Regions:
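Hydrophobic ligand-binding cavity/cleft-lining segments
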Residues: 1-62
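Intrinsic-disorder/low-complexity, polar/charged segments enriched in Ser/Thr/Lys/Arg/Asp/Glu/Gln
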Residues: 2-8, 67, 77, 90, ...
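Short, surface-exposed coil-to-beta transition loops
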Residues: 4-6, 75-80, 100-105
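A short, structured loop/turn motif at beta-sheet edges
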Residues: 12-15, 83-88, 107-117
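Hydrophobic pocket/interface hotspot
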Residues: 18-22, 28, 82, 120, ...
């Protein structure tokens, strides 16, 4: 199993709020709905040299309390299901309907009463050829994912 870890990210919310949101994926629904039509977000995406039409893909994301699924090019639907929760510390996911067997952990730790930090770890069953082709992309993707999760306004969800 190949292992990829993000850098540690600071979060401007207490660990209890972060855990409450990430351990119940249904709580992300309002944020996804708002993001689809957010002009300020579209402008930021343009500034980053990306196509804001990518936000349209958010309508294809399916959420339940324990599962998130989304279409993936050339693969079909990919899903992550929560398989373990450790109160205010960790949420562990497992891939479903994915060509690659993988587990993903989101670890949260308190820093102060009002802030916390997080790190994401991905363990994926990759053959050597695939690892060579996508390893660096997974490393960057996990780090970008952690940065994105650290920016969620947990105190307002």
């Amino acid at each position: 199993m190949a292992k990829y870890e993000s850098s540690v990210q600071q979060v401007n919310a207490p660990v209890e709020r972060v855990y409450a949101v990430l351990s119940n994926l249904e709580k992300l629904r309002p944020m996804l709905e708002v993001a689809q039509n957010n002009e300020m977000l579209k402008e930021k995406i343009r500034e980053a040299g990306q196509d804001p039409a990518m936000l349209e893909k958010l309508k294809d994301v399916t959420l339940t309390a324990d599962r998130i699924s989304f279409p993936a090019p050339m693969v079909g639907e990919v899903a992550l299901t929560i398989i373990e929760r450790e109160q205010d510390r960790c949420v562990k996911f497992e891939t479903e309907k994915s060509p690659i067997e993988a587990n993903l952990w989101i670890q949260e730790l308190p820093v102060t009463d009002l802030t916390s930090k997080m790190r994401i770890t991905l363990k994926a069953d990759l053959n050597p050829m695939i690892k060579m082709m996508v390893g660096s992309k997974l490393e960057k993707g996990i780090d970008d994912f952690a940065k994105m999760l650290s920016q969620i306004p947990y105190n307002f969800i």
